[in-house]
C-alpha cells in the first residue's frame, strides 16, 4: 500500500469528496472515456 498510485493503476478523475489516492509524481489521471469518473494513472 502506497500513498500514491503507480502508472497503470486505477484512479478517480472526479472524486466528489470520496477518499482517493492521487497518482504518483509525474503521472496524470486519464479517464477511460470522456465523462468517466474513473481512469488510470499515465505519464503525460
UniProtKB/Swiss-Prot annotation:
- A Gene Ontology cellular-component term: extracellular region
What tissues contain this protein?
Answer: Granular hemocytes, small secretory granules.
Q: Where in the cell is it found?
A: Secreted
Q: Which superkingdom is the protein from?
A: Eukaryota
Q: What are the disulfide bonds?
A: 4-24, 11-29, 23-41
Q: Per its UniProt record, what InterPro entries does this chain match?
A: Antimicrobial_tachystatin_A
Q: What is its main location?
A: secreted
> What is this protein called in UniProt?
Tachystatin-A1
Q: Which organism is it from?
A: Tachypleus tridentatus
